[in-house]
């Protein structure tokens, strides 16, 4: 199961990223937990509990504590968390990779959904999150169900 955090001070972008992630997970039969945070300060207030997340989608330009500072705090807790910067500012890309971000995605890109899908695919391969499925035949058609969802 993927545990994902979205940290963005703009609700419209948090919701958009959330919907894209859920679409990916639904299409790929991957169970997940997704939590949203309205600021870097809110996220790093979790302290050591930040380590429960596999992936953090992180905006860079936020009030109080920006995304780069948030990423630095994440790295103090864990080097295993995949950091994905999703931002409107291209000029921070080099700094973003200094905290070992796996991707730097521009929010206003018309291919945002495809880019996030590709990003999760890449992370999934690294994490080796292979979902075993069982095929069931119904009158309405065939449905593949992840085995971990079956009792």
Where are the regions that the model predicts?
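A generic structural motif
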Residues: 25-34
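Switch/coupling loops of ABC transporter nucleotide-binding domains
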Residues: 2, 32, 81
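Conserved SAM-binding loop
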Residues: 6, 36, 85-86
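CheY-like receiver
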Residues: 50-129
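Conserved binding/recognition cores within well-folded domains
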Residues: 117-151
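Short, well-ordered amphipathic alpha-helices
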Residues: 14-24, 43, 71, 120
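Helix N-cap/capping motif at the beta->alpha junctions
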Residues: 36-45, 67
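Conserved acidic segment of CheY-like receiver
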Residues: 2-21, 56
